């Protein structure tokens, strides 16, 4: 995503990256970064939680409008309401996808 953000920025369009991996976004030189400690797939918050989603969006817009230097990073001060380990477990499907299943099988067959 940071590479895409820089490409869009080169066209004159400002961007902000909302990410669960802000340190990686910094390493990849994303122009503006909002770090969130949320499970993957939920960058703006819990499904149907409009208050949490709005806080994430408002911070992203403030960073977009107010960042004065390249690679500005601001972390959202909101905790996921469920322990992250439990949230990740819930997020994972009960059965692995065909490609993950094949990968796991190939690992088992290695000496």
PLM features: what roles do these ranges have?
Residues 30, 47-51, 88:
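Surface-exposed beta-strand edges and their flanking turn/coil or helix-capping segments
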Residues 62-111:
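Extended, histidine- and acidic-residue-enriched regions that form the cofactor-binding/catalytic faces
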Residues 32-37:
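Short, hinge-like loop/turn segments at secondary-structure boundaries
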């Amino acid at each position: 995503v940071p590479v895409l953000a820089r490409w869009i920025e080169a066209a004159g369009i400002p961007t902000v990256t909302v990410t669960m991996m802000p340190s990686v976004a910094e390493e990849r030189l994303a122009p503006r970064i909002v770090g969130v400690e949320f499970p993957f797939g939920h960058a703006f918050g819990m499904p149907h939680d409009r208050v949490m989603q709005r806080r994430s969006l408002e911070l992203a817009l403030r960073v977009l409008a107010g960042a004065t230097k390249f690679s500005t990073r601001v972390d959202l001060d909101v905790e996921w309401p469920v322990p992250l380990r439990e949230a990740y477990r819930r997020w994972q499907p009960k059965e692995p996808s065909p490609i993950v299943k094949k990968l796991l099988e190939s690992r088992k067959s290695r000496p």
